């Protein structure tokens, strides 16, 4: 028999009754029932119940054992009686009567419990992540992550993609998020950077004559953490394809993403044909470029009902700004003053002056609007708004006014909040859409200049003719995002492959030829030697796993994440390094100056 085990802790079944076996694992919990010890023994695969009778030679040893000790058990497989079968365990029809027990490893007093999985401070969980990962839920999350990534790989390979690995030490590209810099010992005073994404390398692969590339790529960005974004490191499904147009990429990746979600959705419905929604339409209807389409609320322009009205706040906004609009956010079933006042208070908590509203009651055969806005604009305009929005008794709507470029995101947040508060969001589906036709440029109000709105390497719609003749702020890009349930899970574009156009668009964003050649010299040079039309995308692996596992925080599906302060509490990183190491790199640390 093997030194440590003949079977794992999920392997034994009723057909194994009478077999002499050896199991090893962690003591999940111990229960004393009338002097008989019942031990749940756990390993990577599952749990098996061990029974230790007081007349067994193993009993005295087992009395000393505590939770999370590692033991080896020899014993015989026995059938459980019908009344004690545990249907929640694959091994629930059997138990092992222990003959011998060997203690392989002891555990100190636990800083957090493994059994039961109560809520526990996150910093403790991260500091003792090796214990946290023993919890059944965390173990399942990590194993599901592995299964999802394996499935993605299979689908990519079946679709004709080849997996390549690109360098992790590269040049700094500071026009995006902050880089993680790596000092060079050999070339003192110079720095490598960890890649924010393999963007240039994957395009260079297309220049190198390869056709369909993918990798599960580690990416590094020195940015502030959020619940749906880990500090420091994350992983993306990175792809690139040669000789393709936008629809080719979408048509290739849509069935792959859909199949992965269907495989791991646990019965939730998955959109069968992903709709294409323009960026402008998404902002107009949903107040977001990553709309949650499970939410049935559609925002509407009701400006016409407020021109020259007696609701002077909105009327003056419309009169004083030709770009101003009034948007209505319908709230079916939200037609009571308590809910409307609660939403108004929420808006004020978000730094807004408030959230105007109307709610409708039935007076005989007629609908009556209630609230300050209805009182000011009168019955006719109030009824026209209700008719336009298709609202009934017991419904409400909320209003925002001004320049949509400034208030659209708040309108979108209001739509989300209303949908959540009124329980309008279908939690039993994954609702996908492609967002297309993004603006290529945007106005940077702080620096009074034009900036790239998204990926600077994308192809402008209309090509060089659009770049030469259009107002830059009106140019659209062949860029697209894939959104699901209010999250952006993928982003991509058709790439510019012309060196002349590359210089032109970067010049519009204030970057000279010299800067382009310095920062993107490899890609720029490659464009001069026969660059194929190409495009691709990158999908957030961590975010996909988070959605499929139904968790709200990426740390719940990541092995050894940092905390919200970008600290690795398990490995004590970042850490001080020795003076010798700094000297080798030609680095001197200056004390931080307090300017207060």
Swiss-Prot record:
Main location: cytoplasm
Region span, Aspartate: 199-202
GO biological process, one term: aspartyl-tRNA aminoacylation
Gene: aspS
Disulfide bonds: none
Protein name: Aspartate--tRNA(Asp/Asn) ligase
Matching CDD domains: AspRS_core, EcAspRS_like_N
Function (record text): Aspartyl-tRNA synthetase with relaxed tRNA specificity since it is able to aspartylate not only its cognate tRNA(Asp) but also tRNA(Asn). Reaction proceeds in two steps: L-aspartate is first activated by ATP to form Asp-AMP and then transferred to the acceptor end of tRNA(Asp/Asn).
E.C. number: 6.1.1.23
Protein origin, superkingdom: Bacteria
Catalytic activity: tRNA(Asx) + L-aspartate + ATP = L-aspartyl-tRNA(Asx) + AMP + diphosphate
Residue numbers marked as site, Important for tRNA non-discrimination: 33
Positions annotated to bind ATP: 221-223, 488, 540-543
Protein species of origin: Bartonella bacilliformis (strain ATCC 35685 / KC583 / Herrer 020/F12,63)
An annotated Gene Ontology molecular function: aspartate-tRNA ligase activity
Self-association and partners: Homodimer.
């Amino acid at each position: 028999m093997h030194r440590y085990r003949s079977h794992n802790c999920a392997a034994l079944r009723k057909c194994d009754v009478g077999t002499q076996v050896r199991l090893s694992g962690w003591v999940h919990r111990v229960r004393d029932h009338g002097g008989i010890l019942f031990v749940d023994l756990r390993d990577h695969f599952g749990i098996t119940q061990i029974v230790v009778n007081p007349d067994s030679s193993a009993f005295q040893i087992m009395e000393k054992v505590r939770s999370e000790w590692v033991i080896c058990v020899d014993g015989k497989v026995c059938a459980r009686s019908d009344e004690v079968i545990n249907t929640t365990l694959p091994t629930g029809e059997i138990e092992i009567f222990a003959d011998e027990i060997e203690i392989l490893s002891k555990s100190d007093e636990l800083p957090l419990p493994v059994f039961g999985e109560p809520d526990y401070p996150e910093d403790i969980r991260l500091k003792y992540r090796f214990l946290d990962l023993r919890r059944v839920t965390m173990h399942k999350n990590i194993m599901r992550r592995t299964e999802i990534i394996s499935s993605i790989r299979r689908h990519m390979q079946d679709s004709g993609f080849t997996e390549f690995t690109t360098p992790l030490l590269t040049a700094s590209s500071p026009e995006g998020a902050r880089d993680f810099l790596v000092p060079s010992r050999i070339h003192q005073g110079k720095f490598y950077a960890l890649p924010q994404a393999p963007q240039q390398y994957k395009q260079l692969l297309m220049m190198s004559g390869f056709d369909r590339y993918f990798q599960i790529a580690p990416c590094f960005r020195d940015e502030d953490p959020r619940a749906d974004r880990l500090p420091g490191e994350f992983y993306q499904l990175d792809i690139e394809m040669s000789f393709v147009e936008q629809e080719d990429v979408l048509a290739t990746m849509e069935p792959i993403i859909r199949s992965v979600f269907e495989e791991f959705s646990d019965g939730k419905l998955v959109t069968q044909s992903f709709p294409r929604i323009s960026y402008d339409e998404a902002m107009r209807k949903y107040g977001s470029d990553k709309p949650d389409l499970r939410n049935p609320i559609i925002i509407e322009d009701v400006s016409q009902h407020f021109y020259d009205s007696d609701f002077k706040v909105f009327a003056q906004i419309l009169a004083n700004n030709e770009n101003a609009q009034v948007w209505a956010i319908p709230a079916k079933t939200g037609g009571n003053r308590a809910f409307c006042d609660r939403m108004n208070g929420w808006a004020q908590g978000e730094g807004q002056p408030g959230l105007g509203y109307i709610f409708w009651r039935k007076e005989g055969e007629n609908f009556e609007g209630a609230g300050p806005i209805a009182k000011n604009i009168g019955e006719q305009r109030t009824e026209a708004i209700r008719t336009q929005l298709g609202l009934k008794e017991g419904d409400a709507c909320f209003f925002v006014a001004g320049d949509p470029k400034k208030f659209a995101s708040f309108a979108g947040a209001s739509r989300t909040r209303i949908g959540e508060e009124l329980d309008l969001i279908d939690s039993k589906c994954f609702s996908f859409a492609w967002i297309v036709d993004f603006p290529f440029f945007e106005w940077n109000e702080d620096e009074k200049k034009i900036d790239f709105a998204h990926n600077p390497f994308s192809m402008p719609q209309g090509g060089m003719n659009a770049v030469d003749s259009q107002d830059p702020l009106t140019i659209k890009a062949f860029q697209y995002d894939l959104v699901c349930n209010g999250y952006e899970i993928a982003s991509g574009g058709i790439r510019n492959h012309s060196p002349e156009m590359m210089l032109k668009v970067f010049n519009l964003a204030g970057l000279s030829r010299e800067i382009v050649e310095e920062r993107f010299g490899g890609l720029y040079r490659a464009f001069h030697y026969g660059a194929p039309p190409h495009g691709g995308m990158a999908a957030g692996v961590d975010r996909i796993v988070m959605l499929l596992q139904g968790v709200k925080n990426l740390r719940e599906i990541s092995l050894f994440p940092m905390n919200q302060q970008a600290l690795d509490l398990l490995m004590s990183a970042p850490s001080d390094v020795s003076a010798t190491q700094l000297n080798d790199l030609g680095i001197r640390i200056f004390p931080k100056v307090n300017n207060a």
